[in-house]
């Protein structure tokens, strides 16, 4: 009997690793949320013939017992990619332990890239715009020689090199030969981008400056969900939410900084009882949760089983754009920052446009501000389910109430919304941005605004507003909805607002 037990224990031990931890109490598991590792690796480990190998692009701290913590640069073996947002992965040779341990758990899929791929290189930033490349390189943490490589906006298959030189970002086209190879000038061709980078980190050879360190990746992506468990089951226990600090209040309820599961900072919108029908909200929220874009606030979860209803989203620490603009008043925010705000909002709205989704209440109060000058559109779709009461709200014969000063004339008349009525609202948002959060149609009631709009009145050009910026506003306020620009067009107009024809350095500079 004893020999049978010994053989049975030998068989079960690798599968019951947590039972054998008494052997070495000095071992500290860095991530308490990961699965406990075996005391000793099995003979077939690390099973490098199974799964795909990835590199972490950012740090991630486990949020639940099923998650896996890791740091940028760590190597991970992905075991299951069946869920879009969360993959099951194993940590290979966890740094700092020296024990070759392998820990297992779920990871956000947008935090990793396949090992030895271009996306895994710290200097590769993918399909970002030229303006975004400049903004990221100009962060104070970057020094002269900081650089990144991105996909070319105009030449498919080509790349662009962006370099910081004494506070100025310069761009170079990296061209590709049909037979393979990359070059700035044909006198020096490289078989891979890695060779290209290695060469120009040793010599400038015609560049404005020798390449030094890759641009810091400060803009960390938002996980699609709170955790793997809430990805599909997103009605969560309200006891898992702590309300820490009230950030603001309005006609619908309050907004709080909160903490989920004692691990994850979140924003919590607590709604006044009766402000919406829970069933209507859940139908809309199901769609809202599926909308994923870097410039949209991510809806994480809800608590609807009792009042007050909780809406849990990602946290943006600087509050609404309206308050952010009003508090600054022009002290630090100038035209270049204002155009950037508008471009980021247009980017998020262009995504909604591509998904045939209408916001219905686009305004500075519904744009939120995060770290590193990040702006995201919030509360998209909620106007359809809120029941509101305000003197500047127009109530149609269908008992739907509208924020008149931001609403397109045709939507006021017919109560029919479209992406083109959102474009009108975007024009009002541009007015808010350029005036540092002033109320549009100041001094007018909602009824007076309706009367003035019927006579083709438009907000006048603010004193500090450039003609180019005001022209974009007027395009948004075209009386014919079909004549208003798309958000895609508005996005590129604002992205290229300061651009000239000489945005790329001449490759003749490389010819000796």
From Swiss-Prot:
Gene3D superfamilies: Phosphorylase Kinase, domain 1 (3.30.200.20), SH2 domain (3.30.505.10), SH3 Domains (2.30.30.40), Transferase(Phosphotransferase) domain 1 (1.10.510.10). GO terms for molecular function: ATP binding; non-membrane spanning protein tyrosine kinase activity. The modification Phosphothreonine is found at residue 185. Its EC number is 2.7.10.2. GO terms for cellular component: cytosol; nucleoplasm. Disruption phenotype: Mice are viable and do not show any histological abnormalities in epithelial tissues or develop any pathological and/or metabolic disorders associated with the failure of epithelial organs. CDD domains: PTKc_Frk_like, SH2_Src_Frk, SH3_Src_like. Pfam families: PK_Tyr_Ser-Thr, SH2, SH3_1. It is an enzyme of class 2 (transferase). ATP binds at residues 247-255, 269. Residues 49-117 form the SH3 domain. The modification Phosphotyrosine is found at residue 394. Interacts (via the SH3-domain) with PTEN. Interacts with RB1. Belongs to the protein kinase superfamily. Tyr protein kinase family. SRC subfamily. Non-receptor tyrosine-protein kinase that negatively regulates cell proliferation. Positively regulates PTEN protein stability through phosphorylation of PTEN on 'Tyr-336', which in turn prevents its ubiquitination and degradation, possibly by reducing its binding to NEDD4. May function as a tumor suppressor. PANTHER family: TYROSINE-PROTEIN KINASE (PTHR24418). This is Tyrosine-protein kinase FRK. It comes from Mus musculus. The gene is Frk.
